[in-house]
Regions:
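A short acidic, Gly/Pro-enriched loop at the edge of an enzyme's catalytic core
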Residues: 89-97
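Conserved catalytic/acceptor-binding region of the Class I
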Residues: 110, 117, 121-194
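Conserved alpha-helix/loop element of class I SAM-dependent methyltransferases that forms part
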Residues: 15-34, 48
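Class I SAM-dependent methyltransferase Rossmann-like catalytic core
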Residues: 2-14
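Short catalytic micro-motifs in class I SAM-dependent methyltransferases
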Residues: 101-102
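Class I SAM-dependent methyltransferase SAM/SAH-binding core
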Residues: 34-90, 111
Length: 256
């Protein structure tokens, strides 16, 4: 499990794409020439950008070979590049940097956000969405399982938890000195999923991956079984058997 799985991620494509739509709706540009989709994944967010800005040159950047393979199949007219976003820099003429659900994975993301915004020309836009759910049960239970099982002394497993985001005020003070306009807001989604098992499947495509990668096949199954039991106890099934997955997300749109 050294790579992110596009197939697993896309099991919930509609739900995962919804924040991209909400972020894109707040981008105040009419006809940008060059757009870069940072952390483009399998191209679902890139497709939205291509639909809204059909005349633009659009590139996607990601570190996952499997995600990029799927993105290239989906959008052969776009350019996709393998790169570490933490070290990547935009071309001077880039007018929109679109980063949906990627920056939260970078512990140094505040410095990365500030550097990317500073690299944009006047009027350029940095649009960011980050998962802000580390205190919600689904992620708290991942940390519980990591601390309780036979893998508890494995430093890779114990260190797999994502850092909390900082308060909105922090991002405002960080970025406002560099831009003419800054908008920061939260949206809390309540995704209707088929049942507790669907929650496990959701996070197998994202935040469970760093916990599972260091384990062998048997360890992964045991980890998932323990997590599955905790999720079933924490998320009550509604009258129709479905569950609601609460998912808060932080949005930032900065105009240089």
């Amino acid at each position: 499990m050294e790579d992110w799985s596009a197939r697993q991620y896309l099991k919930f494509e509609d739900e995962r794409t919804r924040p991209s739509r909400d972020l894109l709706a707040r981008v105040p540009l009419d006809a940008p020439g060059l757009i870069v989709d940072l952390g483009c994944g399998p191209g679902n967010s890139t497709a939205l950008l291509a639909e809204r800005f059909p005349q633009a040159e659009i590139a996607g950047v990601d570190s996952s070979p499997d995600m990029l393979r799927r993105a290239r199949e989906r959008l052969p007219e776009c350019k996709f590049v393998t790169a570490d976003i933490g070290a990547w820099s935009p071309q001077p003429e880039t007018e929109l940097l679109f980063a949906n659900a990627v920056m939260q994975w970078l512990p140094e993301h505040p410095a990365v956000l500030r550097r990317l915004l500073a690299a944009l020309p006047q009027g350029g836009v940095l649009a960011v969405q980050m998962a802000d759910n580390t205190s919600d049960p689904a992620l708290a239970l991942q940390r519980e399982v990591a601390a309780e099982g036979p893998w508890a002394n494995n430093p890779e497993v114990r260190g797999a938890a994502r850092d909390d985001l900082l308060p909105p005020e922090f991002y405002y003070d960080l970025l406002k000195p560099l831009c003419a306009r800054l908008d920061v807001w939260h949206i809390v989604y309540n995704h209707v999923l088929a049942g507790p098992e669907a929650i496990v499947e959701w996070f197998k495509g994202s935040s469970l991956q760093p916990y599972l990668r260091p384990l062998d096949a048997g360890g992964r199954e045991k980890f998932l079984a323990a997590y599955r039991d905790k999720i079933a106890a924490a998320y009550k099934q509604r009258f129709d058997g479905k569950v609601l997955l609460r998912f808060p997300r932080l949005f930032i749109v900065a105009v240089r």
